[in-house]
Amino acid sequence: MSSAKLGSASEDVSRRDANYHPTVWGDFFLTHSSDFLENNDSILEKHEELKQEVRNLLVVETSDLPSKIQLTDDIIRLGVGYHFETEIKAQLEKLHDHQLHLNFDLLTTSVWFRLLRGHGFSISSDVFKRFKNTKGEFETEDARTLWCLYEATHLRVDGEDILEEAIQFSRKKLEALLPELSFPLNECVRDALHIPYHRNVQRLAARQYIPQYDAEPTKIESLSLFAKIDFNMLQALHQRELREASRWWKEFDFPSKLPYARDRIAEGYYWMMGAHFEPKFSLSRKFLNRIIGITSLIDDTYDVYGTLEEVTLFTEAVERWDIEAVKDIPKYMQVIYIGMLGIFEDFKDNLINARGKDYCIDYAIEVFKEIVRSYQREAEYFHTGYVPSYDEYMENSIISGGYKMFIILMLIGRGEFELKETLDWASTIPEMVKASSLIARYIDDLQTYKAEEERGETVSAVRCYMREYDVSEEEACKKMREMIEIEWKRLNKTTLEADEVSSSVVIPSLNFTRVLEVMYDKGDGYSDSQGVTKDRIAALLRHAIEI
């Protein structure tokens, strides 16, 4: 706790301090840019030539279905599948209808199953029954087969006992075999045991897989080179976007004006790029990066620095959504409020320029107001000493975790669908949005509740569950981890049941959940980004792949 005066606060008040570390990047992304494409028309020509070669490989008719399945999977895992969405969909439809899978071995069946389920095709897990022996047990010692089986099990839904058995079997075998494996299979297995592909940020997974694939004796040279060039080309685009975001952040001078808050514009960009990296979603990334930046400042103000009176004034100003309201909030908050209004006004202008209409901006503003209300409730928990029930806490945290907001804003930014109907549906917090939000909350609370308690907070999913069900801290944490698995199964199930409206929400729900899995796998990688988060950002946004 500290006595602090910021802005024009009229009196000293006791305020908390989370002691967040300063940015680990300084002005690096403000000045750095890739020279990969600079005066290099030959690279663009080579990229186009290789893309056509890969497309030809993908669409050519063949009776060798296992090879076609492996090629399709490699294209997706290498991060270049977005170039061939139509062709991949056509291939998967053929593979879904084909009965020759009865002749596939366990390795090919596992890849086939994961590919199809991962793209929304309903495939029964009974396809694995024929790989059990007379004792009802799986039996294989082949590491590559075990790796593929393990990856496939993470698309399981509730009640699939055979996949529950398969995940235990394959994990145990892989852990035992790992020390004996050599590159690149050892890294493939290690990565999967750490974060399986289905739960990994797809851009990060591609960065990991590109050198692994390149070392395979059976690699296709044109595909390997295409993946490297495409990664570096996309990285150059992402660097330009982050440079623009860093310039905006610096112009507002948020770090010096709000020293109690997290200075994490690069980490926020990594978050949004992880959710949708494709070039066509540049507008959405730009908007969402600024949104996560301003939301993070508001969150820290409500959680750490602001008094209850101050944050209540800010909440009221957000409800008014009027520049005149800035006069009614403390001076130190005004830069946040002005920045917030500016983001939405800029986004509105971009929507009009890009699509000729801006009706969706009302959805964006409303969902932003909703998250501020949820922050207000959490501030009231702390300042009044009110302890909510577990269900009450979770109901509010589904909103305060931000994933409903991010999913809806991402849908608006992407603009691919009949938006009004989709946004009306997503605003009701349907099952896939709820599952994604709950996974985010459980993961977040497991990694942050102790740090929050050190600064005086006593309300978290862990503590509320302990209090309500009279269990130990260890038991409550175990329950949270079990709930993460339950919600992942529910999320998987909703993707298989998606209709025309809900299918547009599948990818945002999955990708935002994946980002949380990765960002919080070794702690709160957003608040403390000095370790593995910094390394991952550097791999994606700083270091090009050698060609």
UniProtKB/Swiss-Prot annotation:
It comes from the Eukaryota. Its EC number is 4.2.3.87, 4.2.3.93. Induction: Up-regulated by methyl jasmonate. Mg(2+) 3 binds at D444. It is an enzyme of class 4 (lyase). One of its GO terms (molecular function) is sesquiterpene synthase activity. The keyword NADP does not apply. A motif (DDXXD motif) lies at residues 299-303. Mg(2+) 2 binds at D299, D303. Sesquiterpene synthase involved in the biosynthesis of delta-guaiene (78.2%) and alpha-guaiene (20.9%), two structures composed of five- and seven-membered rings. Also produces 0.9% of alpha-humulene. Belongs to the terpene synthase family. The Asp-Asp-Xaa-Xaa-Asp/Glu (DDXXD/E) motif is important for the catalytic activity, presumably through binding to Mg(2+). This is Delta-guaiene synthase 3.
